[in-house]
């Protein structure tokens, strides 16, 4: 549903350019993570917790990348599963967090605070 809503027709980085120039409505990695998190939370799963994470948050060269992670209720993010529909242009990639072959994930709040983007942390805490 999100791939249709985002009008995905290209690989992720090309789609990002189109979102950033206004020719596509949404579809940046953080859009996918935010919308996926909202949909999963709306399901009200009592046995799962949602986490948000960012990779490459310290890199000046690589783009940072956001995702949603699910874990057993009460478990740490690192024990969860990465749910990343951005990576393959709308096809869901999933992997245990610690086995992700491409990204090393950190809790979103930690990365945002460290990088001085506190307003995003506060907005996430309110919503």
Predicted regions and their residues:
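Cysteine-nucleophile amide-bond enzymes
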Residues: 34-35, 62, 66, 119-122, ...
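Mid-length scaffold segments of soluble, non-membrane domains
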Residues: 17-52, 56-62
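Sparse, context-dependent recognition of short Cys/His-centered cofactor- or disulfide-binding micro-motifs
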Residues: 14, 30, 53, 68, ...
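Hydrophobic/aromatic-rich core segments of domains that either
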Residues: 45-92
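A recognition module on extended beta-rich or small alphabeta surfaces enriched in W/G with H and D/E
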Residues: 75-127
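Secondary-structure boundary elements
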Residues: 1-18
């Amino acid at each position: 549903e999100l791939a249709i809503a985002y009008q995905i027709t290209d690989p992720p980085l090309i789609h990002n350019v189109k979102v950033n120039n206004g020719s596509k409505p949404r579809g940046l990695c953080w859009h996918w993570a935010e919308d996926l998190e909202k949909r999963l939370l709306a399901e009200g799963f009592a046995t799962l917790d949602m986490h948000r994470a960012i990779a490459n948050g310290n890199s000046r060269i690589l783009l940072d990348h956001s995702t949603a992670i699910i874990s057993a209720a009460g478990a740490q993010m690192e024990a969860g599963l990465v749910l990343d529909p951005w990576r393959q242009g709308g096809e869901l990639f999933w992997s245990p967090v610690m086995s992700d072959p491409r990204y090393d994930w950190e809790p979103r709040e930690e990365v945002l605070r460290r990088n001085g983007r506190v307003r995003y942390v506060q907005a996430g805490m309110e919503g």
